[in-house]
Amino acid sequence: MSDKKSNANGVYPQEAVKSDIVKNEEFIGEHLETLREFAERGDASVMYLLGCYYDGGVCEGGGNDPDEAVKWYKKVSRLGNTHAMNNLGVMYLCGQGVRKSAAKASKWFRKAAELGSVVAQKNLAEMYRYGDGVRVDSAEAAKWYRKAAEQGDAEAQGILGVMYYYGEGVRKNVAAAVKWYRKAAEQGDCGAQNNLGVCYDTGTGVAQDWAVALKWYRKAARHGNACAQTNIGEMYETGRGVVKSAVRAAKWYEKAAAQGYAGAQYDLGELYASGNGVAKDLHAAEMWYRKAAEQGYADAQYKKNSRRQENGE
């Protein structure tokens, strides 16, 4: 049930200028020569602005010239700009304007991370956690997530909670997991809200309290978290802390299944197979089992195969 957060699409965040000017690429384009003059004279803020303008990954609709972006990022990085250092790391990781190099990416992320950049700390942690161009090092990942978490970053807090929950790179400590989940959940991180709900649901690291579990599941579900939607469905199906209702369970499973969540697809298949909360429909059951099985859900694979044998297929 715990929603293990990951950057599955491999997109590492870059940092953009917080000024209104970066939102007006037309203005920048019209005054480009003047801005370049300021940058050549050593104006660090304009150097970074030009880097963002030329970097299509940061400033959509800008110059889209990775070579120029790298040039200005490097110049301003030498002056200690951590945003530029982080963005250089992303460009090396993706091979934009430079030869792709995970080693150089981690070098720039580390430089920015050591100077306190939360985004760079998370990017460096991400590389070590998933072995993206470097050797997997869960302890190193946990170290950098902790630094970002201690600066109040909700995403890092939620991930650090997961690492404590499973003992990933740190000694397993469910009390510490609950602590970090709570910090992130109170900031609105829906993954942490779901995970905190799991802890209350199961009595892991806290006294079991289904009402509190449901509260956190609902907060996450309102943000579209499919895992939380499934967990609410399971509470209604089993009557944990709520009036038992297979009809309401089906409603929540449908929300999560529509998002492609395999656990909900399997659970919905079970309801259709038994006619519990929905009209019995073996074809619908097989469809949902198949969808879950295609994502590697083992129980669904077994049920799908069983249905095929019953149908003589």
Regions from the language model: what does each represent?
Residues 40-43, 54-59, 78-81, 94-96, ...:
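Short helix-capping/linker turns of helical repeat alpha-solenoids
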Residues 47, 85, 99, 121, ...:
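Canonical tetratricopeptide repeat
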Residues 283-298:
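TPR/TPR-like (Sel1-like) alpha-helical repeat modules
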